[in-house]
Structure formats: C-alpha cells, structure tokens
C-alpha cells in the first residue's frame, strides 16, 4: 500500500493536491474525545492572486505593489467568512444570535464589589495564588497546556507571590526529583458517596506543588485523560455507565479548594485553566458562597482551547452538588460554560483568539452566548516561552550552539546533522522546511502533504516530526518513499525536535485554528521563520515579511488552502536565496522578545483589578 501511494505521489497530478485556482471549502471533523463538543467547522478559501517571483520583493509579492518596501505586497483577501446560510445550516439557533455592538473582547477593569485587604498576603504586595490545571511540566505533559501552567506558576513565584499548583497524581506522573510528603486528606461528596484523596506536598523551583492521590480516579493506564472503559480494556459499546471523566475532574475542582483549607492557605486568586478546572469558579459561587475561608478569593479562568469543554449528561450537575440550571447548556452539563459564567475574569491565550471566540460563532464552538454575556469581556494574553529553556546558545540537544551573530554557521552545522539523521541529501544551501506538531487535520497536515511536491520541485527539503493516526502515518511513509533524500520523518520527541528547530530555515504551521501556539515562538527563537495561517495566536505573533520586510519574522498564508500554502512556500524559497533579506529576517525573529515577562505583567494587572488594589504589585 505504501509503495502504491508513493508511485501516485510521483504522478504529474499530485494525489493530495487541491485544484489550482479553485475556491475550496474545507470541513474539518474534529475528534475531541470524551466530554467534548464535536462540530463541523467550514473554513473557506478566499480569492487568490497570481504569484510574482520577481525581485525586488525578495519573499515574492502576491501582486505588484506601489509601496516603497522591497518586500511590500498588498494583503491578499483573508479567508472569507461563510455566508449566513452556511451558519444557519450549521446551527440555526446559533446563527441567529447577533454579536453585541460593543465587542466584549477587552482588557477593561473588572468591577470591584469588595475591596481586598492584605491580610492573606505573605508580605505587602505579594499574593497567595492557586494555579489549577490538569497538567504541568515537568510532572505530566500531553500538550502545550503543561508548558503554560508550569511557566506561569514559576514566573509568578519568581516575582514574590506564594504560588500553589494542584495536580492529580496520575499513574505516569514524574516526581522530577521533588520530595513529596503526606500533608493530610481531603474528602468530597459525589453522587451520594464520599471520595477521599491524600495530599502530597513538595516544592519545585519556588512553587508549592500539591498532588491529589486518588488511585481509582487518576492512577490508570492510558494517560491523564484515558476513559475508564479503555483502562479496563472494554470497547466503546461497553462504556455506558462506566466512564467517569465528569466525576474525575469534578472531584479535582472541589478537592483543589479543600486542599487549600487543609493547608490553611487562603487564596487571594484562584487561576483555573481549561475545562478540567473550570468548575472551581462555580463551586466558589455556589457551594462555597457563604464560606468565610474563601470570602475574599477571586477567580480567573483561562481558556486554552474552547473546543474542549467538558460536556456531559445533565445528571452530572446533581452528582456534584449543583442545581441543573447552574451547569445546563443546551440540555447538558457543560463545565466550560459554567466557568465562563461564574469566573470573576475570563482570559484566553491570545488577543486574536479572544476576538475569534467572541465574534465568530464558528470559533466559539457553541459558547458564544455566555462569552458575549460577560460585561467585562474576555481578555487575550499571549503565552510566552522560557528563554533559558529554549536557547540555541546553550541547548544541549542540538549539534552546535549559536547566537544571532553566528546563526548562519550554527544553522549550517545543525542542518547537516539533521540531514544525516533523517537520511536526507547533505546540502547546506538547500532550504529546509520542517513540521513539528501533531499530524492532525486541525494542524493542516493535509495541506502539508499536498505542498510537499512543491517543496521538492523548488529544490527544498521537508522534515516531519510528529505522530498521527494510522492513515496519516501511512501517507507520511509514502511521502518519504516517493521523495528519497528530499523528505524525511521522525517521531515527535521533545529532545529530538530541538534539532529540527535549530536546523530548519522555515517551520510550516498551517493550522485551521490555533488559540496561541508555541512552536512558532520557539522557531523564531532558533532563527527559523514560521509559515503560518492568519488565525488565533499565530496572527498575533508572526509579522509577515511581505508586509514589513524590515521587522517581519515569518510568512502568513493568505487563505486556508493547499494552493495558498504552496504559494507561501514559493515566496519563502525566493526570499531564502536573497543575500540580504533572509539574514535580516532571521535576525528579526531571533531578536523578538517572546519571554513570559510581558504576559506576567498583564496577569498581575488583572489580579490587582480583581482584588481592587491600586498601583503596581510590590516585589
């Protein structure tokens, strides 16, 4: 089968390619797992203009431009929004819901009802902050959420705050050299019974880490989010009445609050992340609304990906001690909806993603009503990366260290190392494109496969690091077989992928939606120019070289379609061979500040607004 596909790839008409010049409607089917919403999201390609490969526009103008900049090109139409009829077909009730005239995407101050005293603070200006997220580096990681929860916790601690991070103690959780000690137990009523967890407490880089030890809920095979029927070796047909994700994370949310009581730490701020922790604000507003221990506590909820909502049967509400109306959303219990409604502040991981989920029902995934109902809005705060962890000058997992001044030499050495590792032709002058992500439809893997032929035709190479389903893996293997020496692949590995970033000239990241994204920030740090779609945080973090050749640090695909990606790749190859433009673009990318410091400033300002304190936080 793989050999047959490889032969098809070599035929004149690419077996994956879109018809050139045609408007394409792409309907991703998003498999979100247990407790998730799974809509079909139509995304349409806009009109496309012919490619011009001529200089002086080094990265290839889409059309001749009157502007003085050698990189300038008029912005091609962004992917067209679907017509109202398309929205009605998706969900007539949602389509009929108009957006508010004043967009609730804002960073405005939150109304303060209770002025906060400093009695709970360790010292003047410092806050007791509880961070609640289902995963965190270095203990457990399945995705970017773990990086963000860890970096935010350590960053706030480094600024003088007393930070407590609460995690479930999963079976495959790593202790990371932290010595955990038993600190008592917490008990939570669920469905007429009482569930109890041991509290294990340790310290990691200044952060108090609390593990909830509940073997039945968390110490099971298959990872943090494995369904119970999977852990028991049962089929999906046998799952009815067995799966317990609603109880596992309903317990987690309330147990995190009870842990603070046992440890006698009154939190000033509780910062919950994604649906797994989204019930914490709801517990504060219902079960604990008259509890003096949490009387001065304020809550914030950060939405990392609104597609993951924690949607269950409405009976879940009663099991956790809520009225059904409190969790009800379109006939089911929805944890994310409850958190959006009850949190004192709601943020998400980039300004553009905040706009998308509030203003566009397709991105809101059915939660546009509670989002728009928040009078103070939704604030977008971009994620950062750790500049110490991701530093090509010190990274132990790359072939040669380098900085801005010797990036060309360092890149060449790392490129040769990766080419040798993957069996690619050793060609230092060849533009090297890499992919480092899940090989999924949401990440645009179909467009990447479609465009591989164009990369090879233009004399480039493609290296793919990631993992996908069986069909995707078969297609990847066929691609490598069809283009020996030009296309290589490697399983995704945190250490191995560092060499990809250090070796590459361009990162391909054509996501259909991307709340923030970290790979493009890491790529820029390593002098690799990202090629991205204009969505979510990608639009906030990549400046198109065709619009701003002086400060640009990547290329933005003009529409979500394979032909648009192929044209951006052609632009990239054109610019790569320009003796001045490419080094300048690489320098701009490496000089960019993508650290957590600006975002930590914004989070501290948000906490101050919630607590009603004036002036900067004292450290």
Language model: regions and residue ranges:
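Catalytic cores of nucleotide-sugar-dependent glycosyltransferases that transfer UDP/GDP/TDP-activated
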Residues: 117-619
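Long, low-complexity repeat tracts used as extracellular stalks/passenger repeats
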Residues: 15-121
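Hydrophobic core
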Residues: 9-14
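Sec-dependent signal peptide recognition
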Residues: 1-7
